[in-house]
Amino acid sequence: MRVTISMKSDNGMTATIKVGTYSTVLLAKDADGQILVDCEPFKSETCAKNALLKLSDNWTEINRVKSR
């Protein structure tokens, strides 16, 4: 099963975490739409979320979609 998580920070940054069976990738953009992190691989959803905390302190999950 795959999960796509959309997140937003207090300062306007957005992020998408894609969790698959064998990999987790992170895409993060600043408030102007400039890519900060482009498909960076991580071991887990938690590792990707911890990386987001280095960019901004407050992130909110706005959507979670599960697919097969």
Write out the residue ranges for each language-model feature.
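Local beta-strand/beta-hairpin segments that build beta-sheet-rich folds
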Residues: 4-6, 36
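Short aromatic-glycine-(Arg/Gly/Cys) micro-motifs in beta-strand/loop hairpins
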Residues: 14-36
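Mixed-charge, Lys/Arg-enriched low-complexity segments
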Residues: 34-68
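Intrinsically disordered, low-complexity serine/threonine-rich segments
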Residues: 9-12, 17, 45-47
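Short glycine-aromatic motifs
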Residues: 2-3, 12-13, 20, 57-67
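Short, well-ordered helical secondary-structure segments
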Residues: 2-4, 29-30
